[in-house]
């Protein structure tokens, strides 16, 4: 999200440097097309996290039940 700064219109010295005038987004160029391998890598990491999260969610009650039974 980029908001329009009114000082940019009033200031006569306009910064024409692309690096300084663009927002910083974790090293990514916001005007450049995002490559698919990066998206797929984050998608795979998210799926692995969800699988382990659901596994812990399902196995933790079984551990508590086994500990409480004589």
UniProtKB/Swiss-Prot annotation:
Gene3D superfamilies: NADH:ubiquinone/plastoquinone oxidoreductase, chain 3. Keywords: Electron transport, Membrane, Mitochondrion, NAD, Respiratory chain, Translocase, Transmembrane, Transmembrane helix, Transport, Ubiquinone. InterPro entries: NADH_UbQ/plastoQ_OxRdtase_su3, NDAH_ubi_oxred_su3_sf. It is a single-pass membrane protein. The chain crosses the membrane at residues 42-62. GO terms for molecular function: NADH dehydrogenase (ubiquinone) activity. It holds the Pfam family Oxidored_q4. It is found in: Mitochondrion membrane. Its main location: mitochondrion. GO terms for cellular component: mitochondrial membrane; NADH dehydrogenase complex. It catalyses: a ubiquinone + NADH + 5 H(+)(in) = a ubiquinol + NAD(+) + 4 H(+)(out). It comes from the Eukaryota. Its EC number is 7.1.1.2. Belongs to the complex I subunit 3 family. Core subunit of the mitochondrial membrane respiratory chain NADH dehydrogenase (Complex I) that is believed to belong to the minimal assembly required for catalysis. Complex I functions in the transfer of electrons from NADH to the respiratory chain. The immediate electron acceptor for the enzyme is believed to be ubiquinone. This is NADH-ubiquinone oxidoreductase chain 3. It comes from Artemia salina. The lineage of its organism: Eukaryota, Metazoa, Ecdysozoa, Arthropoda, Crustacea.
């Amino acid at each position: 999200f980029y908001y329009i700064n009114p000082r940019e219109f009033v200031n006569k010295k306009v910064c024409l440097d692309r690096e300084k005038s663009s927002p910083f987004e974790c090293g990514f160029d916001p005007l450049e097309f995002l490559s698919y391998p990066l998206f797929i890598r984050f998608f795979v990491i998210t799926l692995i996290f969800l699988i382990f999260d659901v596994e812990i969610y399902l196995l933790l009650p079984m551990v508590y039940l086994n500990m409480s039974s004589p």
